[in-house]
Amino acid sequence: MLFGNKAKKTSIKKQVLITRQTADGIITYSKTCHPNEGILILRGKSSKNEIVVDGLILPPFSVHGPYYSGFPSYDLPFDLSYVGTAHSHPGGSNKPSLEDLNNYYGLVSIIINYPYTYNTIAAFDRDGNHMELQIITALDDK
């Protein structure tokens, strides 16, 4: 049948695991950039059910302001370990803005808002849906 029953699209919810050292790096960098936004590239590995984030990269030629942060992705060296980005929101919310979604890079977007603590870190997929985030002490803990 051409126009009848469409197959239902099932998506697997991925869990994001981030090492405590990496989360501490995001917190410290966000506090350093405050009152401007800061942006970092996340390194790690992805499997069917989870994304493990275990490192950070400072993107070359990144720009920062009170309401924006970004980087030219064409200046990045090719690296298959990039799994997404982390950036800070100096005020209000850690929810992704429309601009955040339009400039999405990778598999996960981690957003942290002021006052930059473990409790203000959140992870989102490409559509802005909340992803479960777990901070682990080391990769052996997962």
What are these regions (language model features)?
Residues T85:
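Conserved, mostly hydrophobic/aromatic
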Residues M1-Y82, P90-K142:
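Conserved beta-strand-loop surface patch within small alpha/beta domains used
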